[in-house]
Amino acid sequence: SFDELCNTVFQFQYQYNPVYHKWVDLIDSLPSERKIPQKIPALPISFFKEQQVKTGNWQEQKIFESSGTTGMVTSRHYVANLAIYEQSFLEGFERQYGSIQNWCVLALLPTYLERENSSLVYMANKMIAMSGHSESGFYLYNYAELANKIAALESRGQPTLLLGVTFALLDFAAQFPMQLTYTVVMETGGMKGRGRELTRPELHETLIERLSLPSIHAEYGMTELLSQAYSKSGGRYYCPPWMKVFVRKEDDPLAILTEGT
């Protein structure tokens, strides 16, 4: 069961991950006790900025880094086997949207594309390749070219995924309002330092109006967690079966927050 698997993973992490082992010893008086998911201590993401979080002794195949302004300390996620990440994001996507080969994937990821070691760019690049569609690809600020590409795909009834960071989608939709039928617009977040940060309902309402869509989809992922959750409307996210979300109290890492979630 999910609970049994979680306990097995917890015990493995506790035994072989020195950073996690030390953290659990500091906050949990019974680390060897069998745990249900709600009782498993979560590792603060700040540790990914301060320490090398690795389970076992191996040479990393890739180091993913979180986004941040110049001079900011970023999270670093050491990955032993990229094939596991690829299997995770592909199966997670296809559970919600069907085979990636049915889609033309257009990625509007400026700032992310301009820096190295982004897990989001890695995922988008692999999805573009896995789609097998000759017109899949990345876009930076060439909005006119992107608008022409989407219009051509729409005219052929080609299911298209436009995966984009928030500020770029807003800029694109402001300059090129369109009436979309076969295109799924999926935002990945990303408004920091780009003026007033809209609430998600405000963002989706703006994009829905400018692109004539019934809803805006969303992807949630993070450098420190190599799994994604997807929302098809209304901000309700669905996780793959190997992922479950709990909100912890900031001043008590073992307590589940139930109000305001």
Task: Annotate each predicted stretch with a short phrase.
Residues 74-78, 108, 116-119, 173-175:
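Short, conserved acidic/polar surface loops in the N-terminal third of protein domains
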Residues 8, 22, 26, 91-95, ...:
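Residue-level signal for well-ordered alpha-helical scaffold segments within enzymatic catalytic domains
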Residues 15-65, 73-78, 86-101:
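Active-site diphosphate/adenylate-binding microenvironment
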